């Protein structure tokens, strides 16, 4: 799955495998800039530093500039953005518990989460798939994500997160068959494949079940 990396919003740096960018985030390649951003005294300074970060297009591969052309392609990835969370760690646990989560990491600001999900739809169905996926995740997380990032060429800034989550075995999301609600029986069956309802692990089982309810 390839994406396109930009500097200063418009300066195209090239096309790269998404996993390469994710590994760079996990390995701390951008740690210096992210630390400066999170420690900045003013919103103006934070904005300046953030805008200087590399950014990438999770959903498309762009071969010329920021605008989509005939030679460009769909990546098969949809990303969600949660911001200004009071409990980032708790929200990440809920996101990681979902079978569709391919990757997630703490945002540059430190109080948000970037989420990435592999999807089966074509580019023409991107917005419909985004809306369904967003509804599904927002219900699980208990918070509303940013609805404005539905655009195909929307950029996502890099970050620094040694605990970045990556699941190469994540289930591909099909918005035409996935319901935003599941029956209790379906939830119990899925949870049973991930956790055991045994002494010493019942709290983990119930927590996992609740995250997917």
Predicted segments with their positions:
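Small cysteine-rich, disulfide-bonded extracellular modules of the LU/uPAR three-finger superfamily
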Residues: 33-34, 39-49, 53
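Modules that initiate DNA replication and primer synthesis
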Residues: 7, 13-16, 27, 31-40, ...
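Carbohydrate-active enzymes and regulators
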Residues: 21-24
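Short beta-strand
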Residues: 103-109, 146-151
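Short, solvent-exposed beta-alpha or beta-beta edge segments that form flexible loop/patches at the rim
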Residues: 50-68
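Boundary/junction segments of secreted and surface-exposed precursor proteins
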Residues: 1-4
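Short, conserved secondary-structure transition motifs
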Residues: 116-122, 147-169
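Short, low-complexity export/processing leader segments characterized by acidic and small residues
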Residues: 169-176
């Amino acid at each position: 799955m390839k994406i396109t990396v930009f500097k200063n919003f418009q300066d195209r740096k090239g096309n790269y495998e998404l996993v390469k960018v994710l590994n760079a985030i996990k390995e701390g390649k951008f740690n210096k800039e992210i630390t400066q951003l999170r420690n900045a005294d003013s919103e103006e300074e934070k904005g300046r530093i953030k805008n200087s970060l590399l950014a990438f297009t999770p959903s498309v591969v762009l071969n010329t500039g920021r605008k989509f052309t005939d030679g460009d392609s769909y990546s098969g990835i949809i990303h969600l953005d949660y911001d200004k969370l009071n409990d980032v760690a708790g929200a990440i646990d809920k996101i990681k518990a979902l079978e569709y989560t391919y990757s997630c990491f703490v945002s540059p600001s430190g109080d948000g989460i970037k989420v990435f999900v592999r999807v089966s739809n074509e580019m023409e169905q991107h917005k419909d798939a985004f809306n369904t996926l967003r509804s599904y995740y927002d219900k699980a997380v208990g918070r509303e994500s940013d609805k404005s990032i539905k655009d195909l060429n929307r950029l996502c800034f890099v970050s620094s997160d040694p605990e970045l989550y990556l699941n190469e075995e994540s289930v591909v999301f099909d918005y035409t068959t996935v319901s935003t609600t599941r029956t209790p029986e379906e939830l119990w069956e899925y949870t049973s494949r991930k956790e055991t309802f045994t002494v010493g692990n019942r709290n983990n089982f119930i927590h996992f079940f609740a995250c997917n309810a």
